[in-house]
C-alpha cells in the first residue's frame, strides 16, 4: 500500500528543507512509500496561506520524465501536499518546479506570468468541523 507522510528523520528533513530553500515553520518533506520502500518525496513550504511545492523527487528516476508511473506518483504527492496544506491553513497551492508546470496545468492549475497555482479547495474537500 502506498502512503505519504511527513518525514520522521529530522536530520534528513533539515538537510532537504535547506537544499530546497524551505524556511517556514510548517515546511516539511512528504515521503511516499510502498511498504518500507521509499518511492519519492515532495519538499513543501507553507507561507502566508500558500503551500509551495519546492521540489518533487522520485527514486525511480527524474520526476520530469513523465511516463505513466511517474504521473501517478506526482499526482499522489500533489494531492497529499494539498491535504497537508489544507490541514495547516493553506488556501492556495503553487508549483515551483518549472519543468512540471505542464503536468500541473493538466490537473487544473493555472499558469500566469510563470506562476502555476490552484485553490486547494479544487483538489481536496475542506470540511467545516462545526457543521454536523
Which residues are covered by each model-predicted region?
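Conserved acetyl-CoA-binding loop-helix of GNAT-fold acetyltransferases
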Residues: 66-83
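Terminal substrate-recognition subdomain of acyl/acetyltransferases
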Residues: 34-45, 94-132
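A conserved beta-strand-loop-helix scaffold within acyl/acetyltransferase catalytic domains
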Residues: 18-51, 55-59
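A short linear-motif detector with a strong N-terminal bias
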Residues: 8-11, 23, 30-36, 71-75
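Short phosphate-engaging motifs
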Residues: 12, 49, 100
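Conserved acetyl-CoA binding element of GNAT-fold acetyltransferases
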Residues: 49-69, 117-121
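Short amphipathic alpha-helix that is part of the acyltransferase structural core
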Residues: 1-24, 130-132
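Conserved GNAT acetyl-CoA-binding A-motif
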Residues: 83-97
Amino acid at each position: 500500500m502506498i502512503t505519504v507522510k511527513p518525514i520522521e528523520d529530522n536530520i534528513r528533513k533539515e538537510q532537504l528543507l535547506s537544499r530546497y530553500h524551505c524556511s517556514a515553520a510548517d515546511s516539511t518533506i512528504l515521503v511516499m512509500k510502498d511498504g518500507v520502500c521509499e518511492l519519492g518525496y515532495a519538499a513543501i513550504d507553507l507561507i502566508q496561506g500558500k503551500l509551495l511545492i519546492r521540489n518533487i523527487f522520485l527514486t525511480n528516476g527524474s520526476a520530469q520524465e513523465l511516463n505513466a508511473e511517474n504521473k501517478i506518483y506526482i499526482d499522489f504527492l500533489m494531492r497529499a501536499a494539498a491535504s497537508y496544506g489544507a490541514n495547516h491553513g493553506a488556501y492556495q497551492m503553487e508549483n515551483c518546479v518549472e519543468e512540471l508546470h505542464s503536468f500541473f496545468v493538466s490537473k487544473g492549475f493555472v499558469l500566469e506570468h510563470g506562476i502555476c497555482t490552484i485553490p486547494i479547495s479544487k483538489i481536496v474537500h475542506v470540511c467545516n468541523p462545526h457543521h454536523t
